[in-house]
Amino acid sequence: MYRNVRHAAAVRMSSGNRLLNGLVALLTYGSILVIMLVWLRSSQDTILGLYSASMTGFLIFMYVATAGYKPETDTGFRPEVTVIIPAKNEEGVIESVIRTVFNGDYPTSKMRVIVVDDGSTDRTWEGMQRAEKESEFSDRLKLVRHERNYGKRVALASAIADARGEIVVCIDSDSFVDKDAIRLLVQPFRDGRVMAVSGHGEAINKDEGILPRLQHYWYAEMFRLLKGMESRFGCVSCCSGMLAAYRREAILPIIHEWAKEGPTATAPIALDDMERESWVSRGMASRLIKSPGEDRILTAFALSGKGARVVYQSNSVVRTIVPNSSRQFLRQQLRWTRAWIHGSVLSWRFMWRKSFPASLVSYLFQFLLILSPAIVILWLFVVPIRGEWMGTAGFLAGTIFVGFLHGLNTWKYQRTSIESVPYRMMFVFVSLFITLTIFLYGLVTPWKGGWLTRADGTHQVSSMVPSETPPLETVAQ
């Protein structure tokens, strides 16, 4: 009888979830169409009408596609992996980052870890050495020290040149993987077409203030909704440096180019003649692959191969330290803007050869982002000058409501806290500000950059990273 009661309760819960999901879907698709009609009626401009229709189509496409996304489950696939952690000025966290990797459940006999200190000016190297001495797996850990700062791409190249095994896992030096993250991250590589996999990022320091919490829920949206959509078609545009995995052979040509900029001790990477004559060494592409934005460059090259797929694993969770000051956040967004530009230009060379849905996702998203500054300026400044205040009000109301829908669907799919809804609505104003300032500046200064994603190396994580893996707030769907 007890079993029957439990079964009945489970059926009621399942029915309730289906009803809730149905209501969210109805609200999402119905309201998006209403928003499009409001935007179209609010302005007589052809460009605004075209943008509104394109944005509506993209949102509907995204929600339909991401609804069918599911991560790969564990089937016992355990390839040999090399975990790479490039670091600069991370004395407060580097030991904990290394420990979380070895505290995971991936077989240590099939895992090697390489940590690169890229010319740190603090005590990062000493922290790496302490982790090596204290680890029972020190024979699986290799430390590399650059006497001066060469940049993240050279740090990656130094390690990948020495990597063993088929799969290379890259982890940022301020990011902490869950116990099962690496095990779940490599599962899609059972498919020989998969060249790269992105993990799912969250903010470990979301309780430090409003800005970190805003970023936490924004990450949930960008990973689960956007990458979930892209993953359906095998065209994830960026494997985040927080946690990403690549087939080593798929990225060797770029690593060869990056290694040339590093220490003379860096071993040459053997490439065949065809690879040496690949597009990485010619024209604009040669400059782009040596620009900031390593994550997008690696992803673009991995995806460029014939039949290549790049996917996302929502169940492979990494928790990163996000900026807790506006200055750090804006610097990060500037670097990401430039990286997006470089990765987008590279993708123009090959995305047209992918499937129609993959090409549509890529080119339409780029079209909408490139036009976004002009659209925001028109709605917020030009339209009011013409006396069409209701048009501006309709634009703001519609944009905020889209933020509401993103927060609601993130809660639905990723099972975040329901507070993701109001926080995502608040983030709309942050997005508008970034579009009018950082994004525009990044468009006209695409070649500047450096190690801009690191905060200041002063974070202490003893209170943020317990000895056991922190309890998941999310339950990957």
Regions found by a protein language model. Give the residues of each.
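Membrane-helix boundary/interface segments in integral membrane proteins
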Residues: M1-R12, S347-F350, A374-F381
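N-proximal low-complexity "stem/linker" segments adjacent to membrane-targeting elements
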Residues: R3-S96
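Loop-to-transmembrane boundary segments
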Residues: A10-N21, S355-L368
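Membrane-embedded multi-pass helical conduit in multi-pass membrane proteins
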Residues: V34-A67, T73-G76, S362-G449
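Non-transmembrane catalytic domains and loops of membrane-associated enzymes and transporters
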Residues: T75-M351, T474-A476
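Cytosolic juxtamembrane regulatory segments of multi-pass membrane proteins
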Residues: T82-I94, V430-G442, V461-A476
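Membrane-interface alpha-helices
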Residues: N315, V444-P471
